[in-house]
């Protein structure tokens, strides 16, 4: 409402549309009205005094239990929303330093040339650049200011919902090791063990005993009498050993032996290299190869003074290039090539006269010439003599012709600067312009300068600036005082290597240098002309330089077979061969003698447990244990609390006494005798 009245007053007073500042002020007032209507915002001064009362006051929630009414009709479309608040400074895109320097350079150009056209100023305003209040400078919209101070303390909120069940806590530290347990009962006797291994064979039969003495002669035959038989005499000496017994039978076949240990790898180590074989029989001579086609031209090396010798063939295709020859031997410390013949003179230039060039610039004014010689005196005119011989002067003659225009004088000195003129009258306000196009943001969402802005600056704004700057340079513009030197810019990236420039002009001839060292000997000269003075031959000259390497000759015939070579050294032993196949099964051996009795085997493993015995008599109950720890607290349901009501069963926070409570006594009265809850419990003791 306030915004509407404000707009009406503005329209009545000015008769025009609202300006941007009035519109923003109207939106701010509307926002305050809406906030005051929707929320009861207490005054700022009394927020601390009434904070406790507001916190204690609590509205009744869910007090209305009526069913919801039918949905209403859709309301009219509301007014356009208010502009959003500016983003905090830490969420705004940051402009890189290079982009800031680019904008600052443009602003400096605008500051330097202030008298610009109106079309340029409109485009500058579209890019966020504004004139200063006095109209003498151009300003750039600055960065947003720091965040304002913190607002007053808000009202105390309603109690929050209970949080969800927490996660399991971390695993505790390991406990102390327990005491050693009592010794267990002895287990049952295990089954008999497996038979032990077969014993070793006993020692062979010992040596024969010594032969005893011959028997004594027999005594006389006794007579049977009635005499009593005396006690037995002492044992006689041992008798001679009897004859050796026969060999016993072969013993039974023994049990199968235990499996042996795993053998080594089937593939043995690599053997030594064998001896090299003898050289083979030399092969027979091969057939001669076909002759190649003749080449076209073979140029030889150049002789002194550029004379070359060549051999040209009339027919034949060019053969393949031969292999490179051996490098030549140079006997001089530095090989210098022979200077070639002079080149063919070029064609003479064209004699056609080209078109006449453009007229040259006007030359400067020449110096003033010297003063000419004085002319001869003129002839005196005819004078009339009157009265005493005096000459009478006649009437003045007609005016003479205009003289020649004088020469231009020298340029005068600069005059003093005039006073500043009075300000002109204020012009009438112009007509309202058309609505401009949508502006372009200076900074892109990613924090860099907008590419569309760069294109507009290059295509539209920069050409206009260049034209106006070129016009201002020709006028009498008095430059202002030089500004302070700016900070040193960052080093730019190294540019790509440029193209090679044209060859420069020959330099000036330098001073004559010092005498150099003696050079190497020159090449041999041409042979001199033979003189016919006599048959005497001159002295023999020095040997010439080695000639160029000759061409490679044809392939020679294959050589004779060589003699057989000597016997080579023994080679390294070869690798071990693969394991051979299994042999055939051998014949069954003879039955061996019976072996001695084996030793008792080791104790066998423990047998399986026996069947469960009969249950024993129940023991006496143990002593009462210690009191347990406190239980885990109950879980809170994640739901809002309901309104406070009458006490209900199992929901009241007040503990109830089972003997004195009225509700408990009524419940017990309604229950039958069999379902009544016993008040005491008895424990059976043995």
UniProtKB/Swiss-Prot annotation:
Glycans are attached at residues 446, 535. It holds the Pfam family Collagen. Keywords: Collagen, Cuticle, Disulfide bond, Glycoprotein, Repeat, Signal. Belongs to the cuticular collagen family. Residues 67-79, 231-243, 540-549 have a biased composition (Pro residues). Collagen polypeptide chains are complexed within the cuticle by disulfide bonds and other types of covalent cross-links. GO terms for molecular function: extracellular matrix structural constituent conferring tensile strength; structural constituent of cuticle. PANTHER family: COL_CUTICLE_N DOMAIN-CONTAINING PROTEIN-RELATED, COLLAGEN ALPHA. This is Putative cuticle collagen 99. Residues 142-201, 230-263, 268-296, 394-439, 479-536, 538-576, 577-636 are annotated as: Triple-helical region. Residues 306-318, 563-581 have a biased composition (Low complexity). Residues 42-79, 163-444, 475-650 are annotated as: Disordered.
């Amino acid at each position: 409402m306030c915004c509407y009245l404000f707009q009406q007053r503005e329209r009545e007073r000015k008769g025009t549309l609202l300006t941007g500042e009035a519109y923003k002020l109207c939106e701010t007032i509307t926002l305050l009205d809406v906030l005051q209507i929707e929320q009861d915002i207490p005054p700022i001064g009394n927020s601390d005094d009434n904070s406790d009362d507001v916190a204690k006051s609590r509205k009744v929630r869910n007090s209305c239990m009526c069913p919801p009414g039918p949905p209403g009709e859709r309301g009219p479309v509301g007014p356009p929303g208010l502009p959003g608040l500016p983003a905090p400074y830490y969420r705004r895109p940051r402009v890189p330093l290079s982009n800031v320097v680019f904008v600052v350079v443009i602003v400096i150009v605008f500051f330097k040339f202030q008298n610009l056209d109106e079309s340029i100023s409109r485009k500058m305003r579209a890019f966020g650049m504004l004139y200063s209040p006095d109209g003498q400078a151009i300003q750039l919209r600055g960065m947003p200011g720091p965040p304002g101070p913190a607002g007053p303390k808000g009202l105390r909120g309603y109690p929050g919902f209970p949080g969800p069940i927490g996660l399991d806590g971390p695993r505790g530290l390991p406990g102390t090791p327990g005491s050693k347990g009592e010794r267990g009962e002895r287990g049952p006797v295990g089954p008999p063990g497996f038979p032990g291994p077969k014993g070793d064979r006993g020692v062979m039969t010992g040596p024969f005993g010594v032969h005893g003495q011959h028997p004594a002669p027999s005594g006389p035959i006794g007579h049977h009498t009635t005499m009593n038989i005396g006690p037995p005499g002492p044992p006689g000496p041992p008798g001679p050993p009897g004859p050796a017994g026969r060999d016993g039978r072969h013993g039974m076949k023994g049990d199968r032996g235990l499996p042996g240990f795993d053998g080594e790898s089937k593939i043995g180590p690599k053997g030594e290299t064998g001896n090299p074989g003898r050289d083979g029989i030399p092969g027979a001579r091969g057939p001669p190869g076909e002759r190649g086609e003749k080449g076209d031209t073979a140029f030889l090396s150049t002789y002194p003074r550029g004379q070359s010798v060549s051999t040209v063939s009339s027919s034949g295709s060019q053969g393949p290039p031969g292999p490179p020859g051996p490098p030549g031997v140079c006997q001089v410390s530095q090989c210098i090539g022979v200077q070639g013949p002079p080149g063919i003179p070029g064609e003479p230039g064209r004699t056609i006269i080209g078109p006449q060039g453009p007229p040259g610039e006007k030359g400067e004014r020449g110096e003033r010439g010297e003063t000419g010689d004085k002319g001869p005196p003129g002839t005196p005119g005819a004078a009339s003599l009157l009265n005493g011989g005096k000459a009478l002067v006649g009437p003045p003659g007609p005016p003479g012709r205009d003289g020649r225009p004088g020469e231009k004088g020298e340029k005068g000195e600069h005059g003093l600067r005039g006073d500043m003129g009075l300000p002109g009258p204020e012009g009438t306000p112009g007509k309202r312009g058309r609505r401009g196009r949508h502006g372009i943001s200076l900074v892109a969402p990613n924090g860099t300068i907008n590419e569309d802005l760069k294109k507009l600056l290059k295509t539209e704004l920069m050409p206009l600036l260049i034209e106006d700057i070129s016009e201002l340079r020709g006028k009498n513009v008095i430059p202002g005082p030089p500004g302070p030197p700016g900070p040193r810019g960052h080093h730019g990236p190294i540019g790509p290597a440029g193209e090679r420039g044209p060859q420069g002009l020959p330099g000036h001839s330098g001073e004559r240098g010092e005498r150099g060292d003696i050079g190497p000997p020159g090449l041999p000269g041409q042979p001199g002309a033979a003189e016919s003075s006599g048959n005497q031959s001159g002295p023999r000259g020095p040997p010439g330089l080695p000639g160029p390497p000759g061409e490679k000759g044809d392939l020679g015939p294959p050589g004779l077979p060589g003699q057989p070579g000597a016997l080579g050294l023994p080679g390294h032993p070869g690798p071990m061969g693969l394991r051979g196949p299994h042999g055939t099964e051998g014949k069954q051996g003879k039955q061996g003698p019976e072996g001695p009795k084996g030793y008792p085997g080791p104790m066998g493993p423990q047998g399986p447990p026996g069947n469960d015995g009969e249950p024993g008599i129940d023991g006496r109950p143990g002593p009462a244990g210690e009191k347990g720890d406190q239980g885990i607290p109950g879980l809170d349901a994640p739901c809002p609390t309901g309104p406070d009501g009458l006490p209900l069963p199992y929901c009241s926070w007040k503990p109830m006494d089972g003997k004195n409570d009225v509700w408990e006594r009524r419940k017990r009265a309604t229950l039958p005798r069999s379902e009544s809850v016993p008040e005491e419990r008895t424990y059976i003791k043995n």
